[in-house]
């Protein structure tokens, strides 16, 4: 069945036959070829939102394939929108005609227009198909989104029960922890002030108490309690933070899920799929218009060249021009618009699907975070340990009370057991004494006549108490009551006090057996089944006696009620009998008196019996009840007799009245019985309901336990997967690091060798120069001496270098001891360097991180210093402005002072003028001057005074305005200073926050880039977009080697990181806020945000998520494969232990040894295929002379080589050679490698080696069934050579043995140069020791039984991969000999001999031994027979 594969991000729909896929990776490979998605980035889901499995792949109809790179923030380029099609230019319809009067011209016009319309229909059909394809892609994308959302819901629902259970547990735990944190000191004070019993404290703690009055405090360790109290607030806060963080993350996850579902529903509601059929309808309209034009063209072909036809053609053409052609153009334009609309809708849905997938990835990360936080919260054992000890302090009173109650219970139990045992022993002693007396009496009367003498040994009973408990302190209930009173006087927790009171109440409650005895009395009867098992346990139990006495009182009350009722009935009956016979004169008075006396006596006897019953107990009460019932029946019978007598004498009215009374009494009896039945029924129903409730509760508990166990199983599987993933990561990292260190070490060694060679070359060169200079003139002796000095310097350098090497070794050892003081220093320099490089790797990584941080800090310090300088400049500018304002104020003040001085001067002048005026007036009055001159001067002075007064007024007003302006400037300066200080502090805080935020973004991008590089990805940027590519392992190793060989690898790596970070975020742009210019700051901020946005967070998340999923998939896959391989290995190991090996012989294998043709040499070879020269070392236990084959288990294999040169030595030397040390006991060719096998018989009882037609050991019979397929049918006269005859069997075995002996694998030895070849050439041993070989490839396949027909039921199927066969022989469990007489031989089932092909050549079969492979051996008692199959 074809499977539809839907691609999520492209909307592509593929079909494939699932029969060609055996594993899920094959499907991913096929999808990768079709869609160019890497197989490791493919995720497949079914329509239900679950992961596709290979087992369910053949039943699925649709699967959804996702590219996990899409969910990464930076992989937006993976979703390539489909470009909008070019605008379709509708060509103009043909509208030219050569001759309007010619019908042919009109027909040509119609033809051209028809062809034009046909082209438009074809183009419209293509646009309609493209539109439908776009809508199909939209449908696929929405379906894939639905499956992804369903998968997310399934994942979240899996952890929801665990989260809800954790919420239920966390809230009360936090409350309890808070209570313990706040009140643990109060609980400790309570323990200090609460006295307890010294013996119990010693018993509980196991140590001596030296205090005169021990308290509860002595039960705990005070230091541990104080330490727990100090750690409790921190633990509580940490636990509370974890719980709050989990709650916030979980709420965020659920809110994000609800938002995702709401957005998906919104996307579904506004989906463009409702317009998916518009293009098909529009295409039908276009085709209808074109059909009309085609029909008009066909009609025009039938027109003649008449005026009427020409007019009709012209009219039809005008209709086309006015209606059909514009309509067709309009419809084609609408089709184009539909195509554009569908393409836009598809592109928008694709982009929104990418956003949805990123949202799904975020929620998935929140889900994993919640899961990890749940595990962390469940595993906070340290916090729980702290609170456990504080809880112990809180529960100290209850713990002490529980121990005291247990001591009381154990003491009471011991007393009860001792009392009951002594009572039982005394009673049995009485019975034994009574039996002894009876026996003596019988012996005296009867037994003395016959039989033995008097037997005084009477069987008795001895009671021994075993298993005495450890002596507990002798405490009583009064001690526990006193302890409760002490606690009530102190501020103790009420819940703890209630629990202690409950312990005291439980001491008074009866045991289970006692409760059964109490419940045995029901409805006035005793249920013996409920009485319990032992009657001794009641004796001496005061509580039980008290409860029995209460039941006795209740029964007595019931009895009194019944007796009073009986007395009333008797009285009524007596009165009725007396009143009904007033005229009976013959009734004797004595009878009445007797009846009254009987009645009174019955009353007295009932009272007497009542008193006696109350004194005697329950049994007399029951007998009394029975007696009263009997008397009641007798009275009833008597009343019936009396009524019968009265019926003869009384009237019908009294008779009816008596019957009514009887019926009434019977009715009351029936009501009582019904009440008892109803009570019993209610008891049964209550019991059934109680059982049902218990069953329901038990079922709920079991279901809850099942859920918890399933959750624990899932958690355990997740932990196993995480552990496997971490192990794989560590292993991969260690392998890479080891390779890097090995390469670096090789480079160092090469460099050291190069340096040594270089120094050696220099020495040689200097020596040559010295020799040449010695041969030159004597004038050059100084140069020779200098050269010698240089040689000495070089030698000193060499010695210094050697000393440096020693120092280097010592430095390495010291460095290793400092790096790992606990480790052992290796002796080898290579091992030491490897260990140091391993330690140095971590240090280099840390140094790289610290260098990056130092560079970041340096840049921050520089920018901080520049920012400080700028701030200082701003402050200086502000100070300059303030100084300018102050100078302005000073100038204003100086101006005011000047003006005031001018005003004072003017006032002084005014005063002087006034004085002069007064003087002039005085002079004028005195007549000293002339009137005219004085008048003129007076006027001048008055004018001058007027002007001065005006100037004074104006100056005063100007001074007032200046003072007001000065005051305003002062207020402005103060307000500006306050604002400047506030703004400075505000901007300082803002700058700190901005710096922190910018640096965090910078460091976050830095760490994420490092993470991508460390997990094997390369980050590249092109045209403002970030791309993450996976580095192949070969390139990664090459890069690591290059880095390790270069001493400056760390510098280049840090430089690479700096370049990456420089590409992502410019370092200068980090300090965009340090610009004084607002416009420049805005530009740098925009540039910073643009550069920061180049880091695609979605691509990063998708890459990391994909990497994690790949590792998880590989871990699961390898885990499953390891499990399957381990099981297969166990199975194969178990099977191979019992199978006969025919190649690759090892110790412990089971082998079949067959004799060679030369029996005198004792050569027994192991049956093999392609592995010759394995000979058996003969032992006495093998008894090879009487065997025809031997199945034995190999214990040792010794490889030997034939050396015939030893045989050429003198005879004295050859005779001294031990037989066991002889390397050629079987006369093999020189230089031949052969193997001597020591083997122990695994299954003894192999048959002897008789001749053909003779029997083997009498107790064994071999039944061989040969099934030889595909052999040619012989002709006439060949019946004797049939495989079923003796001759055929003999011939087959001879051929097989000859084929084994003539194997070419045994002829690979070198020729013997000294005649050894001639000696052994004609020897039979040269061919006897050769093993079997496979048949040539040209052998017909039909000759092999494995390629013939089907094997019989007795033959096993042949394998092609296993290299072992089952043992051909199963020995009988018991061999019977002819001399043993009537020994019965057990009949053994057949053991199938399986033939398996060689691994090296599965197509090559052995023809010679095919018949042997199909032979089954069966042992039977009697004789040996061969059956042809």
Curated annotation (Swiss-Prot):
Instruction: Write one Pfam family the protein is assigned to.
Output: ATG17_like
Predominantly, its location class is membrane
UniProt-annotated location(s): Preautophagosomal structure membrane; Vacuole membrane
* GO-annotated biological processes: autophagosome assembly; autophagy of mitochondrion; piecemeal microautophagy of the nucleus; protein transport; reticulophagy; ribophagy
Keywords tagged on the record: Autophagy, Coiled coil, Membrane, Protein transport, Transport, Vacuole
Which residue intervals are annotated with compositional bias (Polar residues) in the record?
Answer: 575-592, 1206-1215, 1333-1362
The record's statement on gene disruption is:
Significantly decreases the radial growth of colonies under nutrient-rich conditions. Strongly reduces conidiation.
Q: Does the keyword Hydrolase apply?
A: no
Q: Which domain of life is it from?
A: Eukaryota
Cited InterPro entries: ATG11 (IPR040040), Atg11_C (IPR019460), ATG17-like_dom (IPR045326)
Question: Coiled-coil segments, which residues?
Answer: 540-579, 616-808, 842-985, 1106-1135
Composition bias type Basic and acidic residues, residue spans: 606-616, 1384-1398
A Gene Ontology term for the protein's cellular component: phagophore assembly site membrane
Coiled coil is among the record's keywords: yes
Region Disordered, residue ranges: 574-622, 1205-1224, 1333-1405
How is it placed in the membrane, per its record? Peripheral membrane protein
Q: Belongs to which family? A: Belongs to the ATG11 family.
Give the function comment from the record: Involved in cytoplasm to vacuole transport (Cvt), pexophagy, mitophagy and nucleophagy. Recruits mitochondria for their selective degradation via autophagy (mitophagy) during starvation, through its interaction with ATG32. Works as scaffold proteins that recruit ATG proteins to the pre-autophagosome (PAS), the site of vesicle/autophagosome formation. Required for ATG9 anterograde transport from the mitochondria to the PAS. Also recruits the ATG19-prAPE1 complex to the PAS. Required for the Cvt vesicles completion.
Looking up PANTHER family in the UniProt record yields: RB1-INDUCIBLE COILED-COIL, RB1-INDUCIBLE COILED-COIL PROTEIN 1
Describe its assembly. Homodimer and potential homooligomers. Interacts with ATG1 kinase and the ATG19 and ATG34 cargo protein transporters. Interacts with ATG9, ATG17 and ATG20.
Query: What is the name listed in the Swiss-Prot or TrEMBL entry for this protein?
Result: Autophagy-related protein 11
Query: According to the entry, what is the taxonomic lineage of the organism?
Result: Eukaryota, Fungi, Dikarya, Ascomycota, Pezizomycotina
Gene name?
ATG11
């Amino acid at each position: 069945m074809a499977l539809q594969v839907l691609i999520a991000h492209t909307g592509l729909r593929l079909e494939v036959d699932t029969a060609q896929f055996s594993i899920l990776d094959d499907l991913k490979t096929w999808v990768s070829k079709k869609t160019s998605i890497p197989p490791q980035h493919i995720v497949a889901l079914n329509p239900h939102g679950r992961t596709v499995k290979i087992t369910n792949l053949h039943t699925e109809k649709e699967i959804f394939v996702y590219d996990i790179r899409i969910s990464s923030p930076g992989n937006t380029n993976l979703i390539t929108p489909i470009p909008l099609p070019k605008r379709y230019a509708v060509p103009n319809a043909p509208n030219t005609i050569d001759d309007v009067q010619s019908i042919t011209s009109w027909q040509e016009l119609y033809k051209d227009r028809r062809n034009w319309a046909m082209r438009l229909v074809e183009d419209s059909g293509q646009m309609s198909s493209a539109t439908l394809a776009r809508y199909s892609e939209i449908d696929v994308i929405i379906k894939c989104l639905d499956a992804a959302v369903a998968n997310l819901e399934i994942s979240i629902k899996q952890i929801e029960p665990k989260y809800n259970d954790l919420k239920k547990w966390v809230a009360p735990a936090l409350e309890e922890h808070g209570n313990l944190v706040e009140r643990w000191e109060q609980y400790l004070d309570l323990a200090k002030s609460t006295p307890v019993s010294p013996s119990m404290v010693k018993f509980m703690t196991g140590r001596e108490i030296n205090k005169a009055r021990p308290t509860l405090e002595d039960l705990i360790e005070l230091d541990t309690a104080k330490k727990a109290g100090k750690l409790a607030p921190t633990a509580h806060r940490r636990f509370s933070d974890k719980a709050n963080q989990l709650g916030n993350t979980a709420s965020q996850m659920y809110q994000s899920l609800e938002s995702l579902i709401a957005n998906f529903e919104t996307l579904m509601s506004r989906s463009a799929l409702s317009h998916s059929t518009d293009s098909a309808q529009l295409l039908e309209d276009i085709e209808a218009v074109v059909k009309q034009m085609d029909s008009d063209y066909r009609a025009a072909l039938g027109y003649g060249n008449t005026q009427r036809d020409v007019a009709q053609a012209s009219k039809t053409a005008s209709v086309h021009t006015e209606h059909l052609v514009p309509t067709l153009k309009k419809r084609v334009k609408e089709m184009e618009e539909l195509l554009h609309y569908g393409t836009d809708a598809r592109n928008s849905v694709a982009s929104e699907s990418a956003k949805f997938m990123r949202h799904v990835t975020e929620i998935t990360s929140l889900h994993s975070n919640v899961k990890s936080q749940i595990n962390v919260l469940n595993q906070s054992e340290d916090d729980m340990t702290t609170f456990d000890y504080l809880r112990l302090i809180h529960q100290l009173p209850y713990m002490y009370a529980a121990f005291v109650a247990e001591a009381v219970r154990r003491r009471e139990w011991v007393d009860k057991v001792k009392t009951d045992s002594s009572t039982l022993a005394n009673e049995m002693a009485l019975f034994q004494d009574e039996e002894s007396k009876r026996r003596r009496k019988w012996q005296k009367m009867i037994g003395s006549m016959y039989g033995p003498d008097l037997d005084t040994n009477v069987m008795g009973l001895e009671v021994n108490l075993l298993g005495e408990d450890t002596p507990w302190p002798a405490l009583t209930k009064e001690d526990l009551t006193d302890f409760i009173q002490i606690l009530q006087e102190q501020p103790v927790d009420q819940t703890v006090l209630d629990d202690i009171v409950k312990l005291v109440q439980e001491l008074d409650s009866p045991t289970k057996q006692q409760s059964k005895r109490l419940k045995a009395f029901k409805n006035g009867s005793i249920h013996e089944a409920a009485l319990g098992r032992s009657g001794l346990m009641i004796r001496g139990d005061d509580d039980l006696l008290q409860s029995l006495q209460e039941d006795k009182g209740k029964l007595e009350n019931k009895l009194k009620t019944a007796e009073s009722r009986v007395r009333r009935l008797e009285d009524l009956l007596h009165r009725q009998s007396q009143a009904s016979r007033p005229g009976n004169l013959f009734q004797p008075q004595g009878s009445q008196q007797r009846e009254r006396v009987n009645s009174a006596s019955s009353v007295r006897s009932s009272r007497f019996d009542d008193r006696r019953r109350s004194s005697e107990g329950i049994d007399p009460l029951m007998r009394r009840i029975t007696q009263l019932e009997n008397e009641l029946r007798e009275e009833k019978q008597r009343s019936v007799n009396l009524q019968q007598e009265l019926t003869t004498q009384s009237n019908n009215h009294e008779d009816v009245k008596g019957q009514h009374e009887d019926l009434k009494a019977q009715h009351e009896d029936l009501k009582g019985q019904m009440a008892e039945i109803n009570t019993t029924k209610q008891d049964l129903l209550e019991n059934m309901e109680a059982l049902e409730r218990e069953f329901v509760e038990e079922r709920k508990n079991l279901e809850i336990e099942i859920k918890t166990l399933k959750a624990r199983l899932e958690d355990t599987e997740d932990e196993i997967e995480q552990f496997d993933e971490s192990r794989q990561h560590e292993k991969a990292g260690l392998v890479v690091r080891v390779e890097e260190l090995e390469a670096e070490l090789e480079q160092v060694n090469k460099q050291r060798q190069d340096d040594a060679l270089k120094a050696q070359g220099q020495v040689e060169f200097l020596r040559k120069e010295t020799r040449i200079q010695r041969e030159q003139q004597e004038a050059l002796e100084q140069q020779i001496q200098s050269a010698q000095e240089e040689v000495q310097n070089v030698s000193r350098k060499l010695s210094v270098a050697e000393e440096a090497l020693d120092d280097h070794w010592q430095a390495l050892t010291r460095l290793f001891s400092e790096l790992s003081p606990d480790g052992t220093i290796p002796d080898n320099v290579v091992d030491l360097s490897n260990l140091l490089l391993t330690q140095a790797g971590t240090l280099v990584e840390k140094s790289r991180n610290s260098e990056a941080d130092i560079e970041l800090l340096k840049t921050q310090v520089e920018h901080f210093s520049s920012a400080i300088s700028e701030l200082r400049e701003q402050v200086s500018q502000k100070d300059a402005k303030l100084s300018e304002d102050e100078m302005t104020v000073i100038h204003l003040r100086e101006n005011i002072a000047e003006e005031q001085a001018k005003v004072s001067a003017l006032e002084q002048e005014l005063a002087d003028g006034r004085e002069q005026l007064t003087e002039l007036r005085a002079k004028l009055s005195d007549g000293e001057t002339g009137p005219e001159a004085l008048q003129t001067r007076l006027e001048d002075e008055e004018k001058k005074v007027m002007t001065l007064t005006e100037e004074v007024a104006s100056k005063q007003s100007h001074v007032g305005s200046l003072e007001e302006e000065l005051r305003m400037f002062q207020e402005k300066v103060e307000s500006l200073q306050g604002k400047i200080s506030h703004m400075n502090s505000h901007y300082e805080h803002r700058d700190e926050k901005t710096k922190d935020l910018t640096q965090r973004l910078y460091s976050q991008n830095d760490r994420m880039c490092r993470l991508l590089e460390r997990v094997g990805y390369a980050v590249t940027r092109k045209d403002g977009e970030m791309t993450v590519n996976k580095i192949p392992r070969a390139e990664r190793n090459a890069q690591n080697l290059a880095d390790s060989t270069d001493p400056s690898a760390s510098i280049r790596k840090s430089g690479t990181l700096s370049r990456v970070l420089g590409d992502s975020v410019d370092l200068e742009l980090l300090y965009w806020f340090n610009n004084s210019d607002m416009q420049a700051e805005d530009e740098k901020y925009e540039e910073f945000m643009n550069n920061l946005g180049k880091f695609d967070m979605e691509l990063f998340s998708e890459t990391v998520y994909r990497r994690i999923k790949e590792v998880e998939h590989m871990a699961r896959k390898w885990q499953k494969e390891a499990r399957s391989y381990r099981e297969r290995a166990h199975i194969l190991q178990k099977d191979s232990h019992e199978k006969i090996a025919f190649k690759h012989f090892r110790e412990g294998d089971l082998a079949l040894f067959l004799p060679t043709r030369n029996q005198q040499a004792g050569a027994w070879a192991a049956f093999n295929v392609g592995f010759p020269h394995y000979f058996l070392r003969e032992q006495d236990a093998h008894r090879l002379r009487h065997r025809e084959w031997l199945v034995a288990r190999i214990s040792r294999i010794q490889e030997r080589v034939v050396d015939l040169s030893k045989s050429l030595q003198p005879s004295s030397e050859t005779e001294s050679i031990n037989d066991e040390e002889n390397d050629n006991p079987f006369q093999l060719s020189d230089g031949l490698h052969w193997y001597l096998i020591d083997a122990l018989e695994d299954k003894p009882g192999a048959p002897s080696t008789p001749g053909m037609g003779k029997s083997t050991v009498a107790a064994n019979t071999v039944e061989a069934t040969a099934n030889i397929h595909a052999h040619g049918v012989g002709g006439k006269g060949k019946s004797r050579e049939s495989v079923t005859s003796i001759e055929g069997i003999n011939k087959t075995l001879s051929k097989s043995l000859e084929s084994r002996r003539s194997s070419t694998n045994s002829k690979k030895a070198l020729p013997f140069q000294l005649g050894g070849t001639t000696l052994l050439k004609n020897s039979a041993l040269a061919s006897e020791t050769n093993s079997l070989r496979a048949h040539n490839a040209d052998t017909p396949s039909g000759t092999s039984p494995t390629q013939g027909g089907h094997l019989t039921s007795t033959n096993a199927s042949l394998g092609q991969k296993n290299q072992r066969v089952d043992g051909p022989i199963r020995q009988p469990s018991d061999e019977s000999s002819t001399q043993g007489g009537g020994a019965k031989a057990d009949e053994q089932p057949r053991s199938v001999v399986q033939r398996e092909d060689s691994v090296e050549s599965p197509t090559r079969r052995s023809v010679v031994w095919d018949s042997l492979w199909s032979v089954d051996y069966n042992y039977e008692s009697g004789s040996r027979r061969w059956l042809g199959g």
